[in-house]
Amino acid sequence: MDVLDYLDMSESSEKFHVSVLSEKDKFKIESADITLKEGDDFKRISTIRNIFDRKNVIFYGKYLSESFVKLETASGKFELPIVNIDHIYDQISKIRNQEKRKTLSCIHISTIQIVLKSTFLKGLDYPISLAITDERINNPKEKIIGIVHGNLATVTLKFSVHLGFAIPLTEEDLSRSISLTYKAYRNDLMNDQKQGFSITYAVSYALANSHHSIQFANKDRIYLDEIFKQVSFTEKPRPISPIKPNGLKFLKKKPSNLEDLIGVPRNHLSLQPPPLRVARKDSEESSSTSVPEIENLTKQVKDISSYLKDRL
């Protein structure tokens, strides 16, 4: 690491960062012409090529819960937390490897499976709705990850949803981030204290040290180059073409097709000029364009064409 004048690296449950600094003359020792173009810099020096790569720490887990529901809580909307933060922190505290334990920063939630099963005879009408919601989202419609409407007359109601995203372990009120919400639409089947059905749910998840860990699930390290490989680069905005005195904007680059130019589908466009109406002597209707006017316009167009040809 003699090529570096400065190196700072740290990783915790809240943040990971690497910062390096090196004098330009030290790059010449490696015979590497360094530029800052598209991130093509330190990765060309063999001694520090992998300095920005990091260990990939993943602990896979699955949580299963089964409980009976009293109908007093099912007669209205009721929320059941899917991610129990106390349980998660208890798991983390029991990880033997302290170095890996202190780097865990997020929980990647994969699949949530839910089964509702009635405690009464098959065929009794008991409609119920079930939804998985992201309570961090403010919009009521957009917070719904998945929803199902069913009837426990069939005894069981099964529901599965794939999330595929991560939540920081430092998220405020993490236990309420992902919720199971259910609502029954009948309150006269049993007394409120009776337990009309059970809820069994399983959550597949992973505790990891990076938001990118699952992308490298089968690798021991997280590679910086691959993270940025799929990043979209934003080009510099091109200046708007100047406006000519006649008010028309002339494009410097010809559009690839007509839709790109005016934003209207091709089948909505008429590429043929409107038919020219010429007044006849025996017509009762008067035309907006007379024959002498047309002849005069034609002569002007020819004169302009000849002028431009001579000038060009």
Swiss-Prot record:
Q: Where is the stretch described as Disordered? A: 266-293
Instruction: Please report any disulfide bonds recorded for this protein chain, giving both cysteine positions.
Output: none
Q: Which GO terms describe its biological process?
A: transport of virus in host, cell to cell
Q: Which domain of life is it from?
A: Viruses
Q: What is its main location?
A: host cell
Protein's UniProt keywords contain Transcription regulation: no
Q: Which GO terms describe its cellular component?
A: host cell plasmodesma
Q: Which Pfam families match?
A: MP
Compartments, as annotated in UniProt: Host cell junction, Host plasmodesma
Give start-end ranges for the coiled-coil region(s).
Answer: 278-307
List UniProt keywords, sorted A-Z: Coiled coil, Host cell junction, Transport, Viral movement protein
Subunit comment: Homotrimer, through the coiled-coil domain. Interacts with VAP.
Q: What function does the entry list?
A: Transports viral genome to neighboring plant cells directly through plasmosdesmata, without any budding. The movement protein allows efficient cell to cell propagation, by bypassing the host cell wall barrier. Acts by forming tubules structures that increase the size exclusion limit (SEL) of plasmodesmata, thereby allowing viral ribonucleocapsids to spread directly to neighboring cells.
The similarity annotation says: Belongs to the caulimoviridae movement protein family.
Name of protein: Putative movement protein
Q: Which organism is it from?
A: Cestrum yellow leaf curling virus
